From Swiss-Prot:
Gene3D superfamilies: Aldolase class I
EC number(s) per entry: 5.3.1.24
Classification via CDD domains: PRAI
InterPro entries: Aldolase_TIM, PRAI_dom, RibuloseP-bd_barrel, TrpF_fam
Keywords, in A-Z order: Amino-acid biosynthesis, Aromatic amino acid biosynthesis, Isomerase, Tryptophan biosynthesis
Record field: catalytic activity: N-(5-phospho-beta-D-ribosyl)anthranilate = 1-(2-carboxyphenylamino)-1-deoxy-D-ribulose 5-phosphate
Protein species of origin: Legionella pneumophila subsp. pneumophila (strain Philadelphia 1 / ATCC 33152 / DSM 7513)
Cited Pfam families: PRAI
Family in the record: Belongs to the TrpF family.
Keyword Isomerase: yes
Record's protein name: N-(5'-phosphoribosyl)anthranilate isomerase
Organism placement in taxonomy: Bacteria, Pseudomonadati, Pseudomonadota, Gammaproteobacteria, Legionellales
Enzyme's top EC category: isomerase
An MF annotation (GO) of this entry: phosphoribosylanthranilate isomerase activity
Source taxon at top rank: Bacteria
C-alpha cells in the first residue's frame, strides 16, 4: 500500500484548537474518548462544544470501553459521530445493535488472537490493533510486536500503540495497515496535543 493513502485518526482529543489543527493537517478522523477512567475522557457537554465546527469528510469516532447500551445510544443522539470504537470486552452482538459503523479494538499477543477477532467481528468496519496492557485501554505509548500481524487479513485493520513521528514510517512500511491511530505520540501531556508533533507525524507519512 502506498503510504500516501494511509488514513489517519488522531485520538484522545479534548480541546477545540487541537481538533482544528488536526483538520488543517488533513486527518481523516478524530477520536473522542467517553470513558471516565481515562485521563483523556470527555463529557457529553464538552464533546458537543469541541466538535461544533467539524467540516464534512472528517469522521468523529466515539471511543468506548464496556459501555452501557443506554450510554452509547445517548452519545449517538447527542453527538454527530460517524463511527463507534469499542475498546473493551464487548461482544459482536453488542457492537452491531446500534446500526452504526463500528471499529473493534483488540490487544493481541498472538496472530491467532487477531484472526479470531476478524472472524468474530465479521461485520465491523475495521479491527484496531493496540498494545496489550494490564493498566491502560490505549494511549500507553508502547508498541507491540508487529510481526504477529497475519498477512492478507480479510478485514481492514488500523494500527495503533506507541506510534510517533520516529517509528510511523517503519510501521506502515512493515505492516501495510489501512489506517493508523495516534494518541500519546502527538501529545504534550495527556489530552493536550503538541502541534509540532502532530505536523511532524503527518509529514513522516505524507511527506
Amino acid at each position: 500500500m502506498n503510504p500516501s493513502r494511509i488514513r489517519i485518526k488522531m485520538c484522545g482529543m479534548t480541546r477545540s484548537e487541537d481538533i482544528q489543527y488536526a483538520i488543517d493537517l488533513g486527518v481523516d478522523a478524530i477520536g473522542l474518548i467517553f470513558y471516565p477512567k481515562s485521563v483523556r475522557n470527555v463529557s457529553l457537554e464538552k464533546a458537543r462544544i469541541i466538535v461544533n465546527n467539524i467540516p464534512p469528510f472528517v469522521d468523529i469516532v466515539a471511543v468506548l470501553v464496556n459501555p452501557e447500551q443506554s450510554f452509547v445510544q445517548l452519545i449517538i443522539n447527542e453527538i454527530p459521530v460517524q463511527l463507534l470504537q469499542f475498546h473493551g470486552e464487548e461482544s459482536s452482538e453488542f457492537c452491531r445493535q446500534f446500526n452504526k459503523p463500528f471499529i473493534k479494538a483488540i490487544h493481541p499477543k498472538t496472530a491467532i488472537q487477531i484472526q479470531s477477532a476478524v472472524d468474530e467481528f465479521f461485520d465491523a468496519s475495521a479491527i484496531l490493533l493496540d498494545t496489550p496492557s494490564d493498566k491502560e485501554r490505549g494511549g500507553t505509548g508502547l508498541t507491540f510486536d508487529w510481526n504477529i500481524i497475519p498477512e492478507n487479513l480479510s478485514k481492514p485493520y488500523i494500527l495503533a500503540g506507541g506510534l510517533n513521528e520516529s517509528n510511523i514510517l517503519e510501521a506502515i512500511t512493515m505492516c501495510h495497515p489501512y489506517a493508523v491511530d495516534v494518541c500519546s505520540g502527538i501529545e504534550a501531556s495527556p489530552g493536550v496535543k503538541d502541534h509540532l508533533k502532530m505536523s511532524r507525524f503527518i509529514k513522516a507519512i505524507w511527506g
